[in-house]
Amino acid sequence: MTGKLAEKLPVTMSSLLNQLPDNLYPEEIPSALNLFSGSSDSVAHYTQMATENVMDIGLTNEKPNPELSYSGSFQPAPGNKTVTYLGKFAFDSPSNWCQDNIISLMSAGILGVPPASGALSTQTTTASMVQPPQGDVEAMYPALPPYSNCGDLYSEPVSFHDPQGNPGLAYSPQDYQSAKPALDSNLFPMIPDYNLYHHPNDMGSIPEHKPFQGMDPIRVNPPPITPLETIKAFKDKQIHPGFGSLPQPPLTLKPIRPRKYPNRPSKTPLHERPHACPAEGCDRRFSRSDELTRHLRIHTGHKPFQCRICMRSFSRSDHLTTHIRTHTGEKPFACEFCGRKFARSDERKRHAKIHLKQKEKKSEKGGAPSASSAPTVSLAPVVTTCA
């Protein structure tokens, strides 16, 4: 097996001059490797090593500097000192005692000191680093938050997909004893209920519902159509079930301007208009319930349709549609005579009357000369003679 460079190793000169014994590495090296397992003579063989003369030697093709000079004699190191080796050895061919082909030489005693228990170990990483003091590590990297159990990290069932088409293995959350905290009820406030129009005098008996905190309350629009239950409550004087057991006083409807022609007969027969207005003094009847709902907004003042541009409210959806055209500039109605465009159909109809009047005037002016050009019969004067 051949060695590759993993790191530069600080080695003393004496270790290069004194050859290691041949039986130091047997053919099958056990897992617990001891570099100095010889007799006392072999240990004394290294007592003359000088620990001060150290140089970096790599296992590559780099040649050392030939100009360096070395002394012929080596003085023994004062005291009982040790030399520490730090590095790794990588091998091309794998062996049964080193599966990862990497040997990490952490430390080895030289002068009769027994090596540490972790002197020689195999690691799966490709580089070794000297660990800094524990205080510096804690200062640079704060400690991670402790976890009581695995359920804090994995609270949902984990499933693994098999590419061969087998069904995934699902692990139930019973293995991870954890319970999710319940959602705070204050996190999502209740949305206001617009199922029924409330009179200003009755707002005190209804619990207050606040919209979302980040949303403007004026932009929360009620539904466009008043529910049919509200109309029946007006008509039959019944208590709406949404109010519970609290009695609701009858809703007073605001009077409206009287009709210009109150006794004008309607084209639709009376029996085909079963929906009558419940307001006092109003004799309006309608054939459809939605027409009555739209009419009741006149009495209640309810304007559920709101423009999101200028925040103006309307009681009818078609009024909102024509109002939005003032912001967009859309004019879909064009005059048939002059091509002028209008945003509302009634404006075009009013404008068309101008052309009709002009046409009538032209026809009148064209008919007057034809009447004057008719031939007139002139009678001859009667001549009388006197005798």
UniProtKB/Swiss-Prot annotation:
Gene: Egr3
Biased composition (Basic and acidic residues): 269-283
Example GO BP: cellular response to vascular endothelial growth factor stimulus
Keyword Metal-binding attributed: yes
Bilayer-crossing regions: none
Biased composition regions of type Basic residues, renumbered to the chain: 350-360
Superkingdom, taxonomy of origin: Eukaryota
Keyword Repeat: yes
Lineage, uppermost ranks: Eukaryota, Metazoa, Chordata, Craniata, Vertebrata
Keywords associated with the record: DNA-binding, Metal-binding, Nucleus, Repeat, Transcription, Transcription regulation, Zinc, Zinc-finger
Pfam families: DUF3446, zf-C2H2
SUPFAM superfamilies: beta-beta-alpha zinc fingers
Role played: Probable transcription factor involved in muscle spindle development.
GO cellular component terms given for this protein: nucleoplasm; synapse
Localization in the cell: Nucleus
InterPro entries tied to this protein: EGR_N (IPR021849), Znf_C2H2_sf (IPR036236), Znf_C2H2_type (IPR013087)
Name of the protein in question: Early growth response protein 3
Region (Disordered): 241-283, 348-387
Zinc finger (C2H2-type): 275-299, 305-327, 333-355
Stated family: Belongs to the EGR C2H2-type zinc-finger protein family.
One Gene Ontology term of the molecular function aspect: sequence-specific double-stranded DNA binding
